């Protein structure tokens, strides 16, 4: 007979007699790595008796003894019913050959194990400092990214190809290689941040922003043609304020990039940058357009503005509305909102307005804490990954401070991320009515990772669903009622609007503060 051997692991099955109970046998399968060649096996015939195997009776071959360089196999050729099994008898030679085979098997398994372990290792050639930084970025995404198909590509193969083909001789070339890698994910929120931008982003979530001190939003019909982004406010004493930029001015360009197609999320990133760096703005004030070059600096940001507004009435019995404008979710946001609520409740407010228009988000934990102020119980948000719900954020009411007063939440297409979580939680728990237009639809959650050279990665690690299990990504939170385009955009204008019963803030008055 011929045995066709290959370089792969080949199965050899045999049945081992059970000496304790002859009526039962043990089926054994060995995987033997055979050499890549064809070898002739020896063939011997033996007579078969119940007591022994005789070599002298060749005329009645009951057993065929087949050997190759690894194993000797005894096949029964008699007509007794054997259920198709091949019986193995051990002999001195067989035991010796079996021992050799087992040694080879162990060697093969050891080699195979080593191969498996080293599959995830970088290529064997020498790695430079730039290569190692690229690998650090690759590993960060590999471990944290929500989509484990990596946009349908082989993430391991991309690593090997990039290390072989992408130039990484300088830090700038390495940054470019990392950006190209991130771009293959086709995720606008997973992005690479050079050291200056990473530092600016981190400081922005800590209550201070290295920028020009502007709060921006989308234009409304009352602002005229949508030819850019509108200035909501300029931080007192900040670069924009000192340059004479006023609320209502339109930003038409940032560093030679038109803002007509920019989201406020992208524009906010462009306005921030390393302290001391310059940014050029094209500002339209009325009919005049100015080009201003501003120097970025650290600007303290108070994320909350609030005001107690009285409706026309009879003196101290006039209904009072507490207006809270939340512009961002930095690490001061929850404490500032708590302080505003407690101050307004101390003045016996009858209802609240929480204005989240043009709030592009920020710190996820701050959004969760603020939701707890308004809810006596319930789910705030579900955190989901590719396998389903991963975590649940809820409240038992222990942090609630304003659960009884009617609440209206104002949103628009500039309401994104953490502010959408807050609006969705208050809506789905029937705590508030939501007014405005569908929100931005940023239903993904990012974590920020610092790399060894001070640069960083913002990586999408999860998505969220509202308490009603609504996935708002690219769809947004749908409001309960529309809001007039001319509705006031800040606390002073809102209080002034309430003094005029014919103004926009009196439209839907029967609904605005109802539960």
UniProtKB/Swiss-Prot annotation:
One of its GO terms (molecular function) is serine-type endopeptidase activity. The active site is at 417 (charge relay system), 442 (charge relay system). GO terms for biological process: proteolysis. It catalyses: The enzyme shows specific recognition of a C-terminal tripeptide, Xaa-Yaa-Zaa, in which Xaa is preferably Ala or Leu, Yaa is preferably Ala or Tyr, and Zaa is preferably Ala, but then cleaves at a variable distance from the C-terminus. A typical cleavage is -Ala-Ala-|-Arg-Ala-Ala-Lys-Glu-Asn-Tyr-Ala-Leu-Ala-Ala. InterPro entries: ClpP/crotonase-like_dom_sf, PDZ, PDZ_6, PDZ_sf, Peptidase_S41A, Tail-specific_protease. The keyword ATP-binding does not apply. Its main location: plastid. GO terms for cellular component: chloroplast thylakoid lumen; mitochondrion; thylakoid; thylakoid lumen. Its EC number is 3.4.21.102. It is found in: Plastid, Chloroplast thylakoid lumen. Residues 198-286 form the PDZ domain. Keywords: Chloroplast, Hydrolase, Plastid, Protease, Serine protease, Thylakoid, Transit peptide. The keyword Lyase does not apply. Belongs to the peptidase S41A family. Protease involved in the C-terminal processing of the chloroplastic D1 protein of photosystem II. This proteolytic processing is necessary to allow the light-driven assembly of the tetranuclear manganese cluster, which is responsible for photosynthetic water oxidation. This is Carboxyl-terminal-processing peptidase 2, chloroplastic. It comes from Arabidopsis thaliana. The gene is CTPA2.
């Amino acid at each position: 007979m011929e045995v066709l051997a290959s370089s792969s692991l080949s199965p050899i099955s045999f049945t081992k007699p059970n000496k304790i109970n002859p009526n039962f046998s043990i089926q054994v399968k060995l995987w033997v790595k055979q050499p890549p060649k064809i070898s002739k096996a020896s063939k011997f015939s033996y007579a078969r008796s119940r007591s022994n195997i005789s070599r002298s009776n060749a005329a009645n071959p009951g057993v065929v003894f087949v050997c190759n360089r690894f194993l000797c196999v005894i096949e029964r050729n008699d007509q007794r019913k054997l259920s198709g099994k091949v019986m193995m008898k051990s002999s001195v030679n067989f035991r010796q050959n079996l021992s050799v085979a087992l040694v080879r098997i162990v060697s093969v398994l050891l080699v195979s194990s080593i191969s498996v372990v080293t599959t995830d290792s970088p290529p064997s050639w020498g790695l430079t400092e730039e290569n190692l930084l690229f690998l650090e970025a690759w590993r960060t995404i590999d471990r944290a990214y929500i989509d484990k198909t990596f946009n349908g590509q082989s993430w391991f193969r991309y690593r090997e190809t990039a290390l072989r083909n992408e130039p990484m001789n300088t830090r700038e070339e390495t940054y470019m290689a990392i950006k190209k890698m991130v771009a293959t994910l086709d995720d606008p929120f997973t992005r690479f941040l050079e050291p200056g931008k990473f530092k600016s982003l981190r400081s922005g979530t800590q209550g201070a922003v290295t920028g020009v001190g502007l709060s921006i939003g989308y234009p409304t019909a009352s602002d005229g043609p949508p030819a850019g982004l509108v200035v909501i406010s300029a931080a007192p004493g900040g670069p924009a304020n000192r340059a004479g930029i006023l609320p209502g001015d339109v930003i038409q360009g940032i560093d030679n990039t038109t803002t007509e197609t920019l989201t406020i999320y992208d524009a906010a990133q462009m306005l921030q940058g390393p302290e001391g760096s310059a940014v050029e703005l094209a500002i339209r004030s009325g009919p005049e357009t100015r080009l201003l070059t501003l120097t970025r600096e650290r600007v303290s940001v108070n994320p909350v503005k609030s005001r107690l507004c009285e409706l026309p009435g009879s003196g101290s019995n006039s209904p009072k509305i507490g207006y809270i404008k939340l512009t961002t979710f930095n690490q001061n946001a929850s404490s500032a909102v708590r302080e505003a609520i407690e101050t307004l409740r101390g003045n016996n407010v009858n209802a609240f307005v929480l204005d989240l228009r043009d709030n592009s988000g920020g710190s996820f934990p701050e959004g969760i804490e603020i939701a707890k102020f308004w809810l006596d119980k319930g789910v705030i948000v579900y955190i989901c990954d590719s396998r389903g719900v991963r975590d649940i954020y809820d409240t038992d009411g222990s942090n609630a401070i304003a659960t009884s007063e009617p609440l209206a939440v104002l949103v628009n297409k500039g309401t994104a991320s953490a502010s959408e979580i807050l609006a969705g939680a208050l809506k789905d728990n029937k705590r508030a009515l939501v007014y405005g237009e569908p929100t931005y639809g940023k239903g993904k959650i990012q974590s920020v990772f610092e790399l060894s050279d001070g640069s960083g990665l913002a990586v999408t690690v999860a998505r969220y669903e509202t308490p009603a299990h609504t996935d708002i990504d690219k769809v947004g939170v749908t409001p309960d009622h529309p809001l007039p385009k001319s509705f006031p955009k800040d606390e002073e204008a809102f209080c002034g609007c309430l003094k005029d019963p014919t103004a926009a803030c009196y439209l839907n008055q029967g609904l605005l503060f109802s539960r």
